[in-house]
Every structure is written in C-alpha cells, then in structure tokens.
Amino acid sequence: MCLSTVYKNKMEPETIVMRNVMHIQCKDGCVILTDLMDRQVAIEGTLEEANLVDGFVIVKEK
C-alpha cells in the first residue's frame, strides 16, 4: 500500500494538508484527499506533483 503526505504549494512541514493519504480524486477544479481513517479534505486547485516512491504529493492551490 502506498500512502502519501500531501502538501499545499510546496514541500515544507508547515504546508502539510494531510498525512496517510490513500486516495486522491481530481474533480471540478478540486483535489479531494482521503486518508486511512476515511477523513476527507478538498482543496481548490490542481495536482502539481505526485511521487509515490518517496510518498509525497504537492497540490497547487488556486
């Protein structure tokens, strides 16, 4: 199982949006994140980068 930490705009500790993300969906200009506990966060923006080997995702906020 590949779990990732999602960051907003840049990869820095203070920009972490969610950890242990297991599902990412891009829909209607939003990136919807779901973690292991089935919690969801929606960010208005686009998926900028996803590195599943290193376990990080960067979402560019609008």
At which residue positions do the language-model features occur?
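Compact, glycine-rich, soluble single-domain proteins
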Residues: 2, 6-62
